[in-house]
From Swiss-Prot:
Protein encoded by which gene: N2
PROSITE patterns noted in UniProt: ANK_REP_REGION
Cystine connections: none
Name assigned to this protein: I-Kappa-B like protein N1
tRNA processing among keywords: no
Similarity comment: Belongs to the polydnaviridae I-Kappa-B-like protein family.
A GO MF term: NF-kappaB binding
Organism listed in the record: Microplitis demolitor bracovirus (isolate Webb) (MdBV)
Alphabetic keyword roster: ANK repeat, Host-virus interaction, Inhibition of host NF-kappa-B by virus, Repeat
UniProt cross-references to Gene3D superfamilies, sorted A to Z: Ankyrin repeat-containing domain
InterPro entries: Ankyrin_rpt, Ankyrin_rpt-contain_sf, NF-kappa-B_inhibitor
Keyword Repeat: yes
ANK repeats: 16-48, 54-87, 92-122
Amino acid sequence: MEFSVRTIINNKVYINGENLLHAMCRHGNSLALSIIAQSINKNYQYLLNEYNREGRKCIHIAAVMHKGQVATELIIILLNFGADVNGRVLCTGDTVLHIAVYLKDYYLAEWLCRRSGININARNICRTHTISNSTEEKR
């Protein structure tokens, strides 16, 4: 049996709730991600914006798992093939910019702010009341 990217994509192989592109972003191999992303036509472009079991898209995984230039390179590849720069994590509403700032990845955050199409005013789910409630409970 011949092993090919098309076979993996057509059969939708999922490992731990992630598609092939999620796994590539998690491992940070920009060359492999680029090769696989190039083989994706419009019929499979949805894989770029598909959520994993943690409620994250490929772009979020790249920002969480990697920092600086590595994260930026992965995200450039994803955006060039149709990923949504303003896509949100399901449970928090975070965008990739929220993640970069939260993780203090200022290289990525600055790069994102220079991109056209980025929503720098995007709001996520506010956690302020949760933090203040948990602080009061500890007193």
